[in-house]
C-alpha cells in the first residue's frame, strides 16, 4: 500500500467512525430535545449520569455538528443539533457582564462561572462554523463579538480573578 492509499484508508476509517458511531451516539443519548443543547455526562452505554451541562461543551458540540455538516456530509440532523446547542448558549449561558457561565442545569440555570474563557472561545467557533453552514451573517457577527469580548476579558486587569495571589 502506498502512502496515498494508506492515508485514504485511515480517512475512511475515521469518517466511518464519526458517521456511524460518534455522531449517532451523541445524537441519540446526549441531545436534550426538551431543553436544548447537549447533556455532557454520559456513561459508555449512553445512560445519563448527571444532568448538569458544561457550557464549553455546548460550544464544542455546536461547532462539531456544524463542522461535520460543512466538511463531512450535509446531514440535516447535525445542523439541527448545532442550532439546538447555539440556541441554548444564547438563551442561558451568558451572564449580564457578557462573560459566560462554566456550568448550568439542564434547564439552563447558572451553576458556576470560572476565571477562564474556554466557554467563550468554543462559543465563538461554534457561531462562526454555524454561519458558514447556513450563510446567516448574524452568527458570524456574533462569533466576532464573543471573540472580542474574550480578548477584552483577558486584557482587562481584575475582570477575571487571578489564578494565584502574588507574594
Task: Outline where the language-model segments fall.
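Glycan-recognition and catalytic cores of secretory/periplasmic carbohydrate-active enzymes
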Residues: 1-167
Amino acid at each position: 500500500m502506498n502512502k496515498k492509499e494508506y492515508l485514504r484508508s485511515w480517512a475512511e476509517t475515521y469518517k466511518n467512525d464519526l458517521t456511524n458511531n460518534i455522531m449517532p451516539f451523541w445524537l441519540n443519548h446526549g441531545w436534550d430535545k426538551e431543553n436544548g443543547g447537549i447533556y455532557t455526562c454520559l456513561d459508555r452505554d449512553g445512560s445519563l449520569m448527571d444532568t448538569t451541562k458544561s457550557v464549553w461543551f455546548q460550544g464544542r458540540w455546536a461547532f462539531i455538528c456544524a463542522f461535520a455538516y460543512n466538511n463531512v456530509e450535509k446531514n440535516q440532523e447535525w445542523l439541527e443539533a448545532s442550532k439546538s446547542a447555539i440556541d441554548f448558549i444564547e438563551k442561558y449561558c451568558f451572564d449580564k457582564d457578557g462573560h459566560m457561565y462554566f456550568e448550568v442545569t439542564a434547564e439552563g440555570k447558572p451553576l458556576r462561572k470560572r476565571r477562564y474563557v474556554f466557554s467563550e472561545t468554543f462559543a465563538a467557533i461554534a457561531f462562526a462554523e454555524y454561519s458558514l453552514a447556513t450563510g446567516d451573517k448574524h452568527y458570524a457577527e456574533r462569533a466576532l463579538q464573543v471573540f472580542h469580548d474574550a480578548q477584552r476579558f483577558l486584557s482587562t486587569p481584575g475582570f477575571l480573578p487571578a489564578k494565584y495571589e502574588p507574594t
